[in-house]
Structure formats: C-alpha cells, structure tokens
Amino acid sequence: KLLKKLKPNVVFSKGGFVSVPVVLAAKACKVPALIHESDMTPGLANKLCIPSAAKVCCNFPETVKCLPENKAVLTGTPIRQELLSGDAREGLKFCGFNAAKPVILVIGGSLGSVAVNNAVRSILPELLKDFQVIHLCGKDKLDASLNGTEGYVQFEYIKDELPDLFAAADLIISRAGANAICEISALAKPNILIPLSANASRGDQIL
C-alpha cells in the first residue's frame, strides 16, 4: 500500500530483514529495486531479494562471483565526505590531548564491544606510557573509574567531532565492519582490525 501511495521511481535496499517485504513489493508494483551488499558475501535478506532486484551493487570485487552476472555492479561503499576533512588540532583540543605522544583511536562498533573495551582497559597503564587513547566504547559502556585519567578519554558515541578524531589518530583499532574498513582505507590510516569470529558471523570479516 505504501509503495502504491508513494509511487517511487526506484527502491534502494541495504539489506536487513525489514528490506525483504519492501523489495518483493517493489517487484509486484513494477518498481525497480537496487540492492547494496557491503559484506564479502550476501546476507540472508539480500539473498532472498536478489531475484527481485534489478541490480545488485557490491563493495568488494570478490562479491561479484556470488551474484548473477547480469545484475552485479561493483560500486564500492559511499564514504561520508566530511570524514576526510577533519582537523587534527581540533581533535586533540577536543580530547584535551597534546602533540607530544601519538594517539590511538579505539572503535568498538556502533553498539560497542565488551571484549574490546575490556582488552583496552586491561592494558591501559602500559598504553599510556607511550600513547594517548581515544576510546569509543558504546552506549552504557563507560567506565566511571577511568574518568580524569591523563591521556585517556572515553565516549559512548561521537558524531560531529568524529572527523577531527580520525584526523588526530595515528593508529585506529576497530571492529572489522565493512563500513569501518572502507572509511579507514579512505583515510589511509594505519589500523588494526578485529573481526567477528566465524561462530558469531558468516566469517566475512575474517576473510
């Protein structure tokens, strides 16, 4: 009903279970659907949607072989341009840091990672001997006992200041999500990526 009311020229889907009925409805309404697959191999939702899609855009060259030849289009992943225009000095100022020590930026994913947070905090005294640490730890995952620690700042989430923090970072430690990989690659920053295990995912991040 919504598609008939809106009468879109095209439907764009990034996957996820909510996308399946929308893409199927688009085909029924004769509205072309474009799918974007960020990961190395298609997820379940996109697999279900591919037969109904006009084209399937993908992030990695290796993904093309998993898709119908007449539908696959290698596009990469769009990068927010503002991420490329950060100011390192502003990033240091925002964190209360100086330029005397290099900066490590730790990103635990959109929801944060207990395992990553615990690992960083367990070796924090050693890290702070040689580095300053910016820690994006996720909602409700701040450690109040570390507030005021010199050379260490923690945030649940950062939005507007993120480009400046990226610019200030000398090393990025991050979960290995597709968007994170593409953004860090675009920034040409040294990085350490932490993939999900094969038990917790399709194994794409390990690949």
Briefly describe each language-model feature range:
Residues K27-R89:
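Active-site-proximal region of nucleotide-activated glycan assembly enzymes
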Residues G16-V18, M40, L44, S110-L111, ...:
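Residue-level detector of alpha-helix initiation sites
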Residues V10, A54-K55, K71, L171, ...:
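Well-ordered beta-strand positions
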Residues S13-K14, L162-R202:
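A donor-sugar binding/catalytic signature common to diverse glycosyltransferases
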Residues A33, V133-H135, N191:
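Hydrophobic beta-strand scaffold residues
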Residues P42-N46, N59-L67, D143-A144, A180, ...:
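Short, glycine/polar-rich helix-capping loops at beta-to-alpha or helix-loop-helix junctions
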Residues A88-E90, F97-L171, I181, D204-L207:
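Donor-nucleotide binding loops and adjacent catalytic segments primarily
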Residues L2-F12, V18-L34, K47-S52:
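Glycosyltransferases and closely related glycan-assembly transferases
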